Amino acid sequence: MHKKLILTSLIALASLGLSACSQTTLPPQAASHVDVTQGQIIDLHSGEPLTDRQLLVKLAGAQRLIVGEKHDNAEHHQIELWLLQNLQKERPQGSVLLEMLTASQQPRINQVKAWLKEDPQVRDSRIQELLHWQKGWPWAMYGGVVTEALRAPSPLLNANINRDEVMRLYKTPRFPEGKKSTAPAVQAALKETIVAMHGGNIEGQQLTSMLAIQQQRDRYMAQQLLSAPTPALLIAGGYHASRSIGVPLHMEDLSPASKPVVLMLAEKGMSITADQADYVWFVAPAPAKR
């Protein structure tokens, strides 16, 4: 039982935001057209508000785009689906990367993608089965985005380390090399976040392990994004996407010339600054869980 609780904590909390979400949200199939929510979009460098169309034009020019989400907000996934559908209309999409897919799933992703080129009639449950989709990511939230990316002509790539690697890092923490990504201020901010998410009930070796897992996930996402065909789009949790503590710092360590554009999907009332992202799209908070 104790081992099971530790594993649950590692998988669900080390990614800083993964949670069991309501299943009564986004429809699982990819729609032919998605209307996005009436939120507030801001250019964080100029402070100017943008329309969704203005944002789309700006994002279309990015060679590497990171979209940060709050995992349990259904409107964030609706926006992501809208981006997948509409960025492709502005220019060919080079690749899409998802935090929700791990390295070991890539062969299955490739097989399913090739199969879907034949446009078969297929149930969502069958796609989940073939992908070995992880139940921690509710299909009701992610099904539309995943199906859209699978049916698109561009590659769909994993952006997360395997579960066995998570367990190895927990037992023997090791950190990526780099000045920017492992700076004391960055690690202190991540530790503070991890402690807060555990209600203050984490310290010592367990905290070090959780920090190592988070930073190795960030490093892997950065490596995947840098090697992906461009224009590349990475969808991940907000902490991974953040310029101040996440993937962009690892990209700077690995390839200083690479400058990803970051769009943070947030909820009204959150404080998002230009240190964290280039653009922010505010929507209503996710309904409280019952």
Each model region followed by its residue ranges:
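Gram-negative bacterial Sec-dependent N-terminal signal peptides
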Residues: H2-C21
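Compositional signal for N-terminal targeting/processing segments
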Residues: C21-R290
